[in-house]
């Protein structure tokens, strides 16, 4: 018989830097989950990723105080800002442009994000990422 699910916890945790301090500790503690067990497992799984890159994670809490977690790909905005070498998007995205990225960079981001996107094919994923970039005030060259 399957375990009874008591809830889901959604967090964004920096890769390789999970520790019991907020927001992780309180979120897991109020459900009675083992905080250190999660931190060790998460840090082990994110070992190969760039340290500090925020990773969305969905933790499924069970009635017997056990848990499982699913890691998603980093947010598209983080990857776009990194590719454009900027710290934040434009406050007026359609009038003030803050940077530019090439189609090749957009395709690389789309490849990374493909698992989490609802796009049917690679071209649709590229258009989705390009739209996100444009809404941040970043021009997409070659598209």
Swiss-Prot record:
Pfam families: Ribosomal_L11, Ribosomal_L11_N
PTM summary: One or more lysine residues are methylated.
Any GO CC annotation of this UniProt entry: cytosolic large ribosomal subunit
The UniProt record lists the keyword Ribosomal protein: yes
SUPFAM superfamilies recorded: Ribosomal L11/L12e N-terminal domain, Ribosomal protein L11, C-terminal domain
Matches recorded under PROSITE patterns: RIBOSOMAL_L11
Example GO BP: translation
InterPro entries according to UniProt: Ribosomal_uL11 (IPR000911), Ribosomal_uL11_bac-typ (IPR006519), Ribosomal_uL11_C (IPR020783), Ribosomal_uL11_C_sf (IPR036769), Ribosomal_uL11_CS (IPR020785), Ribosomal_uL11_N (IPR020784), Ribosomal_uL11_N_sf (IPR036796)
The keyword Heme appears for this protein: no
Protein origin, superkingdom: Bacteria
One GO MF term attached to the UniProt entry: structural constituent of ribosome
Keywords assigned: Methylation, Ribonucleoprotein, Ribosomal protein, RNA-binding, rRNA-binding
Assembly: Part of the ribosomal stalk of the 50S ribosomal subunit. Interacts with L10 and the large rRNA to form the base of the stalk. L10 forms an elongated spine to which L12 dimers bind in a sequential fashion forming a multimeric L10(L12)X complex.
Role description: Forms part of the ribosomal stalk which helps the ribosome interact with GTP-bound translation factors.
Family: Belongs to the universal ribosomal protein uL11 family.
Protein name, entry field: Large ribosomal subunit protein uL11
Gene: rplK
């Amino acid at each position: 018989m399957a375990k009874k699910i008591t809830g889901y916890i959604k967090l964004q945790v920096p890769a390789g830097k999970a520790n019991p301090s907020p927001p992780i500790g309180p979120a897991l503690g109020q459900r009675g989950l083992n905080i250190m067990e999660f931190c060790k497992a998460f840090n082990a799984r994110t070992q190969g990723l760039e340290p500090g890159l925020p990773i969305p994670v969905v933790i499924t809490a069970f009635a017997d105080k056990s848990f499982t977690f699913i890691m998603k790909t980093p947010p598209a905005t983080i990857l776009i800002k990194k590719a454009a070498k900027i710290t934040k998007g434009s406050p007026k995205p359609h009038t003030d442009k803050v940077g530019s990225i090439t189609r090749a960079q957009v395709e690389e981001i789309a490849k990374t994000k493909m698992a989490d996107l609802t796009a049917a094919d690679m071209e649709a994923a590229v258009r989705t990422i390009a739209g996100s970039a444009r809404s941040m005030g970043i021009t997409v060259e070659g598209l």
